[in-house]
């Protein structure tokens, strides 16, 4: 099975795919070149499928690939030292969003979690641009 080199060394390519896959999970829609989008699609489909399994092994495999990035900060109630209720800020990470929000959304779907929409050429170099989004 082939893959695109994307004009980079293997470590640079892996870092690029990690960053773009994490951004797609966080924002659920990104704009990139067509070749990159087709490669990200493979990675994200596998991540979401492992997210649907939801076991510890799947979570650890996804954690090894997805960047440790804060998606949002939510306020939760917690008990203070004196027993009173206080509000605390708790970060929500990309991995947590993948397993708690994105994967359950596709519980009944067997693959095909992403959509690629063609946008037109980039102004600077004419590279074909697309929007890749979660369905």
Curated annotation (Swiss-Prot):
Gene expressing this chain = rplQ
Which keywords describe this protein according to UniProt? Ribonucleoprotein, Ribosomal protein
Q: How does it assemble?
A: Part of the 50S ribosomal subunit. Contacts protein L32.
GO CC list: cytosolic large ribosomal subunit
Residues annotated as transmembrane: none
**Pfam families, per database record:** Ribosomal_L17
Instruction: Tell me if Ribonucleoprotein is a UniProt keyword of this record.
Output: yes
InterPro entries referenced in this protein's UniProt entry, alphabetically: Ribosomal_bL17, Ribosomal_bL17_CS, Ribosomal_bL17_sf
SUPFAM superfamilies from the xrefs?
A: Prokaryotic ribosomal protein L17
One of the GO biological process terms? translation
Lineage: superkingdom? Bacteria
Q: Which organism is it from?
A: Listeria welshimeri serovar 6b (strain ATCC 35897 / DSM 20650 / CCUG 15529 / CIP 8149 / NCTC 11857 / SLCC 5334 / V8)
Query: In which family does this protein belong, per the annotation?
Result: Belongs to the bacterial ribosomal protein bL17 family.
**What protein name does the entry list?**
Large ribosomal subunit protein bL17
Which Gene Ontology molecular function entries are recorded, alphabetically?
Answer: structural constituent of ribosome
